[in-house]
Amino acid sequence: MAVFEKVQEIIVEELGKETEEVTLETTFDDLDADSLDVFQVISEIEDAFDIQIETEEGLNTVGDLVAYVEEKSK
């Protein structure tokens, strides 16, 4: 499974959103995610990809998060 699809799946599951709502351009504000929601999503992504996400700064969109995961997974 590609990184985007897995990240999308986690966001849909954790935030109760529809798959179509989660695109690379979607922001966490667009998803009505508060800081606890973002923390939970990041925690699930860390577990799924076996990485540590050092900071949430600069991770404004789903695309930012996907790019970060791809870089850390190398």
UniProtKB/Swiss-Prot annotation:
Domain of life assignment: Bacteria
O-(pantetheine 4'-phosphoryl)serine PTM sites in chain numbering: S35
Pathway: Lipid metabolism; fatty acid biosynthesis
Biological processes per GO annotation: lipid A biosynthetic process
Molecular-function GO terms, alphabetical: acyl binding; acyl carrier activity
UniProt similarity note: Belongs to the acyl carrier protein (ACP) family.
A Pfam family per the record: PP-binding
Keyword Lipid biosynthesis recorded: yes
Subcellular location: Cytoplasm
Domain Carrier stretches: 1-73
Post-translational modification: 4'-phosphopantetheine is transferred from CoA to a specific serine of apo-ACP by AcpS. This modification is essential for activity because fatty acids are bound in thioester linkage to the sulfhydryl of the prosthetic group.
Keyword Glycoprotein recorded: no
Gene: acpP
Function: Carrier of the growing fatty acid chain in fatty acid biosynthesis.
Cellular component annotations (GO), alphabetically ordered: cytosol; membrane
Name of the protein in its database record: Acyl carrier protein
Coiled-coil portions: none
Keywords: Cytoplasm, Fatty acid biosynthesis, Fatty acid metabolism, Lipid biosynthesis, Lipid metabolism, Phosphopantetheine, Phosphoprotein
Major site of localization recorded for this protein: cytoplasm
